Amino acid sequence: MAFAMRPEWKDEPVSTTGASYVEPSATDLIKPGRRVAHLFPRSVMEEYVLQRVTERVWWVSRHFYGSLFYVGTRGVLLLDPFLGGADATVKAVASVTDLPVTAVVYSHFHADHVGGARRLFELLASAPPRVIASENTAIWMERFGSDLPWPTDVLEWPSGSLSFEDVTLRLRGLPRPGHAPDHAVFLLEEERVGHSADLINIDQLPFGGFAGQDPLVLFKPNLEFARSLEFDWFCGGHGNIGEKSDFDFYLTYLDEVAGLVNEYVPRPEVVPDLSLTDYLGGLDEASRSRLLTGLDNHFGLYLYGRQIAAGHPPAGGGGNPFMSGTIGEWATERKEAVDAAVPRIIERLRPTYGRMYNFDDAQPGNVRLMAMAIQPSLTNR
């Protein structure tokens, strides 16, 4: 039965790629240029959303998280057992096959995407699946001392692979991981389907904070790398099921935002040398001696040095040691310029993007982040 929208609910956002919305189907393959309809209210109201992607691959979504599973001839390969979704995912798998889940892939070691493995293994206790992950993920889990099921099959970074029945699972580590040190794309090669959680939100504007991409200036190269890979369909761990057109949209949007940032808050032509210790050279001997009387380390000097040198007692708390003196003054000036520019940039974006998913809620912060990311600072200039 078709999902029924209610008059009092907010209208569905428009597609970022101009896609047509269709009811999800566990039997019919989704066609190019189509996306699953009413995904946000479905995520609130329904147990899970299931869409067939290829003859052997399904996309499953629950509570704003998404993953893929491949149905072989002897078992099922599941990519990302996201937190809170194990029972629903097992139910979704069982709705299309009687075969058991025999292998699980961790896309990266963030518990919201793989933390459901604990519950999944409880459900599959009679025949626990193997766990596949990159060596970067395996090392990180070991160092952290994770209590999640550990990888049994470790893929060499950045491009290891293994066979799961008739499909090749290929790791393609991102060239400049910013979201996590093990951030990667996984490909089901013969099916031409890709998966990378937290790289792109399909059919949505970028998530608030760009999902923690850091440094933000390296986000675009990672998107370009992922787009260059061989796939027809892609799961981003959040949002809809999508295609390369979703990557094209992201790249275009980032370029447009960057262009507006450079228009409204360009880098100043003259940037001072930003230093935490620029004042030391101008101190007399008594002031230097006062510093050595009150301090025995340069972290403390960053916190309190200017106050002590001026003859004042150190202020409680100390603030951010890397925002003292001229650096703090510079950062405050640039932040004020960015804060003034963001509302104007948002209104320039609104005619094209204003009806898209999370425009008013997430994009002001994203524009601010992008603007600050290109400003010279202590570490970048």
Question: Where do the PLM segments sit?
Answer:
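Active-site HxH/HxHxD metal-binding segment of metal-dependent hydrolases
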Residues: 6, 91-163, 260
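Active-site environment of divalent metal-dependent phosphoester hydrolases
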Residues: 86, 109-116, 138-141, 179-182, ...
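Active-site neighborhood of phospho(di)ester-bond hydrolases with catalytic His/Asp-centered motifs
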Residues: 78-81, 102-110, 132-136, 194-197, ...
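Zn-dependent metallo-beta-lactamase
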Residues: 2-74
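Conserved beta-strand hairpin/beta-sheet module of binuclear metal-dependent hydrolase folds
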Residues: 46-92, 185-198
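Metallo-beta-lactamase
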Residues: 132-175, 180-181, 189-190, 220-225, ...
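C-terminal regulatory/interaction regions
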Residues: 2-19, 274-381
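Divalent-metal (often Zn2+) His-rich catalytic cores of metallo-beta-lactamase-fold enzymes
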Residues: 217-293
